[in-house]
């Protein structure tokens, strides 16, 4: 969304193709952002407003991209074909399925949640797994699914540590 907003400032009309029913991806479900604890909703609202002149397709995915001599044809899941000279593709990310690491008890015990689950709960959404009345302390386990060859992901996600610090604040 930030890239689209900047392209609009430069006089271009970007096309945003969002597979979900609203803009913002994962951030739209989060509570506050690091380092200044800005409410995530404020950022999403600001970027949505900044992108209002873009062509936006919600609940849509890119089905096929064909390279042409002077550009691309993009076929969308809704049947629309777009011809363009340039593509800036931002694919987002998938959260690691924490239940794959059974040793941490996610999906087995209450009060064992991911950073994303906790953000969603902080944002006022109910989560039956979280019982704040029984909590005396909170521990954060870093790198679950990241830097883990057995889980198929040897890279660091670059967000777990900073998110845990923000949530601890």
Question: What are these regions, as identified by a protein language model?
Answer:
Residues 28-59, 101-118, 162, 166-167:
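N-terminal glycine-rich dinucleotide-binding loop that anchors FAD/FMN and/or NAD(P) in oxidoreductases
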Residues 78-86:
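Core beta-strand elements of the Rossmann-like FAD/NAD(P) dinucleotide-binding domain
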Residues 9-12, 32, 49-55, 89, ...:
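Generic secondary-structure signature for well-ordered alpha-helical cores
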Residues 61, 78, 92-93:
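Short glycine-/small-residue-rich Rossmann-like dinucleotide-binding loops
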Residues 73-76:
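SH3/SH3-like beta-barrel fold
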Residues 52, 70, 83, 108, ...:
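Residue-level preference for short coil/turn positions at secondary-structure junctions
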Residues 58-71:
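A conserved short coil-to-beta-strand element within the FAD-binding core of flavoproteins
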Residues 1-24, 65, 91-169:
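Rossmann-like dinucleotide/flavin-binding elements
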């Amino acid at each position: 969304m930030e890239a689209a907003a900047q392209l609009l400032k430069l006089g271009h009309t970007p096309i945003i193709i969002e597979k979900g029913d609203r803009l913002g991806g994962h951030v739209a479900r989060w509570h506050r952002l690091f380092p200044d604890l800005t409410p995530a909703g404020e950022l999403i609202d600001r970027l949505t407003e900044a992108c209002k002149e873009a062509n936006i397709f919600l609940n849509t995915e890119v089905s096929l991209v064909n390279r042409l001599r002077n550009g691309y044809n993009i076929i969308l899941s809704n049947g629309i074909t777009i011809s363009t000279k340039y593509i800036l593709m931002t694919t987002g990310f998938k959260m690691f399925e924490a239940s794959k690491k059974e040793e941490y008890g996610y999906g087995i015990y209450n009060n064992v949640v991911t950073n994303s689950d906790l953000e969603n709960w902080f944002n006022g959404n109910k989560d039956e797994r979280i019982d704040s009345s029984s909590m005396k302390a909170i521990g954060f386990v870093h790198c679950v699914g990241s830097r883990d060859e057995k889980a198929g992901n040897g890279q660091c996600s670059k967000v777990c540590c900073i998110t845990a610090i923000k949530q601890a604040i």
